[in-house]
Amino acid sequence: MIFKPELIKGIAKTSHPYGCRKEVLNQIEYCKNAKQFHGPKKVLIIGASSGFGLATRISLAFGGAKADTIGVSFETGITDRRTGTAGWYNNIFFKEFAEKEGLIAKNFIGDAFSDEVKENVIKYIKNEFGKIDLLIYSLASPRRKDPKTGNIYDSTLKTTSGEFQGPTIDMETDELVTTKVNSATDKEIEATKKVMGGEDWSEWCKLLLENDCLSDKAITISYSYIGASRTYKIYREGTIGEAKRHLENTAIQIDKEWQKKINGKAFVSVNKAIVTKASAYIPSFSLYAAVLYKVMKEKNLHENCIMQMQRMFADKIYAENLLEFDDSGRLRMDDWELREDVQSEVNELWEKITPDNFKILSDYDGYKKEFMQLNGFEIDGVNYSEDIDIEALKRLEP
C-alpha cells in the first residue's frame, strides 16, 4: 500500500509510518547534537505520543539525561478503516531507538483518564520500573469520561465573551477564510475545564504519592499557553483559557502537597506557539503562528517542539543557575515569542494581510510543512512512492 496525505478541514486522516520513524530519528539526532544536560533517570509522561509530550520524551532520553521513560497515550493501530495514527507509530519507533541505546521505553496505550490505566501504570512502576523523578502531564483530548461518576465531558473551542470573528488558514484548500465562533455556555466552559483543566493531573499526582511511586524531590510539569493579545479572545479569554487557568491553579495546590510530602516541585511551563495536532484546530491561531514563524525565523529565534523542549531542560530546569518563574509561579518558555520586537513585527505584518498575500507575508509554507511532518509527510529521506507491506506493519507493537 502507498500512503498518501489526506487533509479534511485541518484534520490529518492519514499518517506515513516510516515518515513518522524518520521524524522521530530527526528529533533524536537534534537532541544528541544540542547542549546536553544531566537530569532525571525515571520519567512518566502522560500524553507522550505527539507534540510537546513526544518532544519531551525524546529530549529526556537522548538530550543528555538518558532517562528511562513510561509513555501513556490513546492511539490506534491499523484497522479496516484506518492505517494507524501518527502517535501509534511514534510510540513504536521511539521505543525501537530507545531500546537500542539500552533505555527502558514502556508504552501504555489507553485512556489516561481511566482508573484502569492509572492502576496498570502504578503497578508497573512499583513492580518493575522504580520511583518516578519527573512526571510530565501533556494531555490534549477532546473528551473525558469521569471514572468516578461515569459522566462524559466534551471540550469546546469557544469564546466566553461574545462572538469571535477572525481570519483562519484552511490547510485543505490553502486559503485564508473567515471563521466565526460563538460564545460558550456555562456548561460548555465547565466541561472544557473538566477535560483540559488540572483535575486529572491532580489525580495522577495524588495516586503516585499515595502509592509511594515518587522519588525524593520529584518534579511534575504541565504545559500551558498564553500567547499575544491578538489571540486572547479565542484562547486565553476563551474556554481553553479557562481550562488552562484551572490547570495553573492546580499546579499551586500540587506544589504545596509535594513540597510537604517529598520536598518536590510542581509548576506549569508556558510554551511558545507551535504547530501541534491540538493547536491546528484553534480558529485564527494558524495565521498568527504562520506570521510568528516568519518573524522568528528572520531573527533566528524560531523553535519547533523538540528545540523548545531541549532548551527548557538544558537551559532552564536542569541548568546550574536558579530556575526563574513569573509572578504566578510559571516557567516562561514563551519568552522569545513575546519579545517586544517580535510582537511589533507580527502586528505590522498582520495589519497588511489579505487572502491574496497571506502566503507572502507569513511563513505559511513552513507552518504547513511542520504540520504535515507531524503525520510523517514532507520529510527528507523518505520514499513516499514505496509500496508498504501492511501485514508487516500490523506486527509492530508499541
From Swiss-Prot:
The active site is at residue 235. The record marks 75 as: Plays an important role in discriminating NADH against NADPH. Transmembrane segments: none annotated. Pathway: Lipid metabolism; fatty acid biosynthesis. GO terms for biological process: fatty acid biosynthetic process. Keywords: Fatty acid biosynthesis, Fatty acid metabolism, Lipid biosynthesis, Lipid metabolism, NAD, Oxidoreductase. Pfam families: Eno-Rase_FAD_bd (PF07055), Eno-Rase_NADH_b (PF12242), Enoyl_reductase (PF12241). InterPro entries: Eno_Rdtase_FAD-bd_dom (IPR024906), Enoyl-CoA_Rdtase_cat_dom (IPR024910), FabV-like_NADH_b (IPR050048), NAD(P)-bd_dom_sf (IPR036291), Trans-2-enoyl-CoA_reductase (IPR010758). Substrate binds at residue 225. One of its GO terms (molecular function) is trans-2-enoyl-CoA reductase (NADH) activity. PANTHER family: ENOYL-[ACYL-CARRIER-PROTEIN] REDUCTASE [NADH]. Belongs to the TER reductase family. Monomer. Involved in the fatty acid synthesis (FAS II). Catalyzes the reduction of a carbon-carbon double bond in an enoyl moiety that is covalently linked to a coenzyme A (CoA). This is Trans-2-enoyl-CoA reductase [NADH].
